[in-house]
A protein has these predicted regions:
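Short Pro-Gly-centered beta-turn/loop motif in secreted/extracellular proteins
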Residues: 48, 77-85, 93
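The canonical Cys-X-X-Cys-His
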Residues: 159-170
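Short, conserved, GDST-rich strand-edge loop motifs in beta-rich repeat architectures
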Residues: 172-179, 281-285, 352-389
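Surface-exposed loop and turn segments in beta-propeller and other repeat-based domains
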Residues: 241-259, 301-334, 380-390
Length: 390
């Protein structure tokens, strides 16, 4: 053994001892209650500040995860956990996701973070918007025939269009599934893709008619560049300052085939109403089994919303335009009530805007009725009405 090798080994051992000594010192400063999990996150670069520690479990009636952020010394505390067996892991910008570590409330668990071996691995956990921002925009000449121009285009491609329903830029949207089929180019693949499922007609109409087909070129270019290895130019910062005080609790409720359009837990005019009470979901077109979450006991129940008229239209009447890569041709959306906007009043009663009958209104609502409301504002057809959960 030569002297250089001995020096290297001694240096490595010294660094390891210093890291262990630092972690032990930092750990000693963490006060835990019996329902907390805490410890220190370190990597080969030392303590990892501003990274997320996730404690998750399937032991409860709902899938449950609580997420916290490490401080400047890499310390974390996941507080006030229900009694269960947890898997704890680390995610952070500049890191690859860590291995899962088993833990229970009351445990001190020091976690090993993994420095991302490449920029591509690091970018896998960047926010979806980092990836979506890579999409190029059409030229003014291309938009010359579009009423509203770029403002209208962006509105439909962002808040009032694609992003209304999809997390554009996540892994599912920034890649093209092989299950879609074989195509001459990615533009054709995107034209096929947006016809998937029961919303296929809506998506195709938005892009092909409202936006005159312009987005297909740019969607294709976007996914082609990503497939070729291009990465986001926007590299997000880790949480700083007060951002590190945020504790997020996530529960998976309702059905895998349903989606949540809205939820409500209180009267927004008086947010003390229904404190620690149930949270009421609105699944819009997907189902008439309205989900209810008990956030204290972590239970997931539902109530069946009924309509007044058996001829009320149903989302299940709409077939998939093309098969979904996830659900095939299944009509996974079946709602008649098609609710939005759950609201609680001052007494904790739950209100919805809901469809309760076919669109044609009763005669007393229409032109020629002597009803005061009809005389002021006659209506021949309506969509949603105000409904109360009884």
């Amino acid at each position: 053994m030569n002297q250089n090798t001995e020096t290297y080994k001694l240096g490595l051992i010294s660094a390891l001892c210093l890291t262990l000594a630092w972690a032990t010192s930092a750990q000693a400063q963490i006060a835990l209650d019996g329902d907390d999990i805490g410890g220190v996150v370190t990597s080969t670069d030392g303590p990892e500040a501003g990274v997320w520690v996730i404690a998750e479990t399937d032991d409860l009636d709902t899938f449950f995860a609580k997420i916290v952020v490490t401080d400047d010394q890499g310390r974390y505390v996941v507080p006030d956990l229900p009694d269960a067996d947890y898997q704890v892991w680390v995610r952070g910008y500049g890191l690859a996701d860590s291995e899962l570590t088993s833990a229970n409330p009351g445990d001190t668990v020091n976690l090993d973070a993994i420095v991302a071996p490449s920029a591509a691995v690091a970018a896998e956990v960047y926010p979806a918007i980092s990836w979506y921002a890579m999409m190029h925009l059409p030229t003014n000449d291309e938009l010359a025939g579009l009423d509203g121009g770029m403002n209208y285009y962006l509105d439909k491609m962002k808040t009032n269009g694609c992003v209304t329903c999809h997390q554009m830029g996540n892994l599912a949207t920034r890649t093209l599934s092989e299950k879609l089929g074989e195509f001459d180019n990615s533009e054709q693949a995107w034209i096929r893709r947006v016809q998937s499922g029961q919303a296929g007609a809506t998506m195709l109409n938005r892009l092909a008619a409202d936006l005159q087909g312009i987005p297909f070129k740019y969607l294709a270019d976007w996914t082609d560049r990503i497939a070729a290895g291009e990465l986001p130019t926007f590299v997000p910062d880790r949480p700083q300052g007060l951002e590190r005080n945020v504790v997020a609790t996530v529960r998976d409720w309702a059905s895998p085939r349903a989606y949540m359009h809205d939820l409500s837990s209180t009267d927004r005019r008086n947010p003390t109403v229904n404190a620690y009470g149930d949270i009421y979901g609105s699944p819009e077109n997907s189902t008439d089994n309205f989900p209810i979450l008990d956030p204290v006991n972590n239970t997931d129940t539902a109530f069946l919303a009924t309509v007044m008229d058996e001829n009320t239209p149903s989302a299940g009447d709409v077939a998939a335009v093309q098969p979904s890569v996830f659900w095939g041709t299944d009509r996974i959306w079946t709602s008649q009530a098609n609710t939005h906007n759950p609201m609680l009043d001052q007494d904790g009663r739950v209100w919805y805007t809901a469809r309760v009958r076919a669109p044609n209104t009763p005669a007393f609502c229409q032109e020629g009725s002597d009803h005061p409301s009809a005389q002021a504002f006659p209506t021949a057809r309506t969509g949603r009405n105000l409904a109360l959960r009884d």
